[in-house]
Amino acid sequence: MPELPEVEVTRQGIAPYLVDQTVVELIVRNASLRWPVPDLAHNIVGQTILSVRRRAKYLLIDTEAGITIVHLGMSGSLRILPRNTPVEKHDHIDLVLANGRMLRFNDPRRFGAWLWYELPEEAHPLLAKLGPEPLSEAFNPLQLLTALKGKKKAIKLCLMDNHIVVGVGNIYANEALFAAGIHPESEAGKIDIEKLTLLVVEVKQILAQAIKQGGTTLKDFTNADGKPGYFAQKLHVYGRGSKSCTHCGNLLSEIRLGQRTTVFCGLCQTK
């Protein structure tokens, strides 16, 4: 599943081709995505795109008339292509521009979304209760300490909770906890400010590095020009269960936590 870095890499790739361009057509070949593509999505036709933003794992395409909200789901991708590029399997939506280019949405598993909203995005049910962006100043040790107060859940589950901080998915939660030396099953509310400070630093550094590397390609993700991300080459624990720890040589442990694969080093990461 594309996580925050992959979505941000996609945003950076498509934005230069969309901003200040006028939409002349919206082609919906298959409206049966995670949520049906609404008829109102066609309201973007005739509008000029003002900006392309990211909130958590959602891409927001802004116009004066409203916002197109795009989620890549499990296997979605967006590509900038010449208009009339032949349609391939799983090419569900084309956003056609006046300059002869188009934005194409491909999603084999159809867990993605293409929605339309006319009110400020803060009021949309998908966006209204999201926590702070991890790369912003709003995500800081004191904010995290306050958000975790009294919580008995495992820290990894809290780190992946979009109400606490957005966009830290399974890959990067594993990596950040390893880098901070925190056991993923540690009771969140009992972690002291010193460890949380280090965790915040590592989350920010790892996400920023992943964006710089073009994201992490494990199976489905390619960026806006069809190229893979290269951060997978820098993973220390995710996908490395039973292999040697890159720091101490101990065999990494693999467990299921919140129905997600969790890999950690029992020596380097303490409760």
Swiss-Prot record:
Gene3D superfamilies xref list: 1.10.8.50, MutM-like, N-terminal
ZnF (FPG-type) residues: 236-270
Cofactor: binding details: Binds 1 zinc ion per subunit.
Requisite cofactors: Zn(2+)
Keywords, alphabetical: DNA damage, DNA repair, DNA-binding, Glycosidase, Hydrolase, Lyase, Metal-binding, Multifunctional enzyme, Zinc, Zinc-finger
Catalysed reaction, written as an equation: Hydrolysis of DNA containing ring-opened 7-methylguanine residues, releasing 2,6-diamino-4-hydroxy-5-(N-methyl)formamidopyrimidine; 2'-deoxyribonucleotide-(2'-deoxyribose 5'-phosphate)-2'-deoxyribonucleotide-DNA = a 3'-end 2'-deoxyribonucleotide-(2,3-dehydro-2,3-deoxyribose 5'-phosphate)-DNA + a 5'-end 5'-phospho-2'-deoxyribonucleoside-DNA + H(+)
Keyword Lyase: yes
Name of one Pfam family that matches: Fapy_DNA_glyco
Annotated DNA binding sites: H90, R109, K151
Stored InterPro entries: DNA_glyclase/AP_lyase_DNA-bd (IPR015886), DNA_glyclase_Znf_dom_DNA_BS (IPR015887), Formamido-pyr_DNA_Glyclase (IPR020629), FPG_cat (IPR012319), MutM-like_N-ter (IPR035937), Ribosomal_uS13-like_H2TH (IPR010979), Znf_DNA_glyclase/AP_lyase (IPR000214), Znf_FPG/IleRS (IPR010663)
GO biological process: base-excision repair
Molecular function GO terms recorded: 8-oxo-7,8-dihydroguanine DNA N-glycosylase activity; class I DNA-(apurinic or apyrimidinic site) endonuclease activity; damaged DNA binding; zinc ion binding
Source domain of life: Bacteria
Family the entry assigns: Belongs to the FPG family.
Function (record text): Involved in base excision repair of DNA damaged by oxidation or by mutagenic agents. Acts as a DNA glycosylase that recognizes and removes damaged bases. Has a preference for oxidized purines, such as 7,8-dihydro-8-oxoguanine (8-oxoG). Has AP (apurinic/apyrimidinic) lyase activity and introduces nicks in the DNA strand. Cleaves the DNA backbone by beta-delta elimination to generate a single-strand break at the site of the removed base with both 3'- and 5'-phosphates.
Protein name: Formamidopyrimidine-DNA glycosylase
Gene source species: Shewanella denitrificans (strain OS217 / ATCC BAA-1090 / DSM 15013)
